[in-house]
Amino acid sequence: MSGMVALWIPRGLWTAVVMVTLVMLSTPGAEGRDSPKDFVYQFKGLCYFTNGTERVRYVTRYIYNQEENVRFDSDWDEYRAVTPLGRPDAEYFNSQKDFLEQTRAEADTVCRHNYQVEAPFTWQRQVEPTVTIFLSRTEALNHHNLLVCSVTDFYPGQIKVRWFRNDQEETAGVVATPLIRNGDWTFQLFMMLEMTPQRGDVYTCRVEHPSLQSPIMVEWRAQSESAQSKMLSGIGGFVLGLIFLGLGLIVHHRSQKGLMR
């Protein structure tokens, strides 16, 4: 795995930016042409990582009015001019042995150091997904429908979602949304399964993710309308029972207070 990160640069290199600006503006090439009243001078420090910190490439770029003039690359181990205007600067930097050694060392002191500091909050960060299942339409058994597996609030984005029907993987009629960024370093996606539920069918959404020790498996069971009605009635009765129990306790508590008076 490889990547590129722009990281914090120490004060020494910012001093170098001022120094190289003065050198550049004092060169004969700069004096022989009109110098704009307003100009932009940029310094960019880039760290390239391969397999974590197994291989680190450090690059610094000096840019004057959107034109790069000088560059240091740890693969070269020295400064080189990108344009003729940058030749005096590259020669000057390479002649400053202490400064050159400092720049060479920054593959470790800047890149590798900041990699370890930032890792727990960036590429090593992991957030477990939340998985739910729902039908797109409330329909009776034996009617075509769409079963949706919602996988939300996970990081990183690498994830595997599969549908199973009665322990057999379903591949036909499976449609997934693209990975959706939530804007807070988490993702979500939806995996839909076209199906015609039969009584007794058990559908399972299986989710595998780096943050999980084992896959998350959420089930949905096909039920007849009468079974659903009985279940809802049972839930409703249980809730009403809790309400009446609570009211009874309140009345009993108040009556006890009245007797004590």
Curated annotation (Swiss-Prot):
The chain crosses the membrane at residues 231-251. Keywords: Adaptive immunity, Disulfide bond, Glycoprotein, Immunity, Membrane, MHC II, Signal, Transmembrane, Transmembrane helix. GO terms for biological process: adaptive immune response; antigen processing and presentation of exogenous peptide antigen via MHC class II; peptide antigen assembly with MHC class II protein complex; positive regulation of immune response; positive regulation of T cell activation. Gene3D superfamilies: Class II Histocompatibility Antigen, M Beta Chain, Chain B, domain 1, Immunoglobulins. Its main location: membrane. It is a single-pass type I membrane protein. Residues 1-32 form the signal peptide. GO terms for cellular component: late endosome membrane; lysosomal membrane; MHC class II protein complex. Residues 33-126 are annotated as: Beta-1. InterPro entries: Ig-like_dom (IPR007110), Ig-like_dom_sf (IPR036179), Ig-like_fold (IPR013783), Ig/MHC_CS (IPR003006), Ig_C1-set (IPR003597), MHC/Immunoglobulin (IPR050160), MHC_I/II-like_Ag-recog (IPR011162), MHC_II_a/b_N (IPR014745). Residues 221-230 are annotated as: Connecting peptide. Residues 129-233 form the Ig-like C1-type domain. GO terms for molecular function: MHC class II protein complex binding; peptide antigen binding. Residues 33-230 are extracellular. This is BoLa class II histocompatibility antigen, DQB*0101 beta chain.
